[in-house]
Amino acid sequence: MNKIILFSAVFLALVFCAEAMPRESVNILNAENEPDDTVDIDEGLPDAFDEDYEQDGHNPYPCRGDC
């Protein structure tokens, strides 16, 4: 019986300490105000896999299957 009382007291103490600790709150409104740090890599770049791009002499990989 003493073990049950001791376990209950320790459990309640742990719950009380956990409730007293500050929680990390996520501020959703702040996330919308942050600047966007993602970069669109397709913007402004020519399509390297396009056949016209390779025929114009702009092929940066000359041995891509032709060697």
Swiss-Prot record:
Localisation per UniProt entry: Secreted
Outcome following mutation: residue 67 to S: Abolishes the ability of the protein to interfere with the binding of host integrin to fibrinogen and platelet aggregation
Transmembrane segments: none
GO biological process: suppression of blood coagulation in another organism; suppression of platelet aggregation in another organism
Keyword Signal: yes
Tissue specificity note: Salivary gland.
Biased composition annotated in UniProt, kind: Acidic residues: 35-54
The keyword Zinc is assigned to this record: no
GO MF term (any one): toxin activity
Annotated keywords: Blood coagulation cascade inhibiting toxin, Hemostasis impairing toxin, Platelet aggregation inhibiting toxin, Secreted, Signal, Toxin
Cellular component GO terms held in the UniProt record: extracellular region
Disordered, as annotated region: 35-67
Residues spanning the signal sequence: 1-20
Motif (Integrin-binding motif): 64-66
Domain notes: The Arg-Gly-Asp (RGD) sequence serves as an integrin-binding motif and is required for blocking host platelet aggregation.
UniProt function note: Inhibits collagen- and ADP-induced host platelet aggregation by blocking the binding of host integrin alpha-IIb/beta-3 (ITGA2B/ITGB3) to fibrinogen. Inhibits the intrinsic blood coagulation pathway in the host by blocking the activity of host coagulation factor XIIa (F12).
Protein name, as recorded: Ayadualin
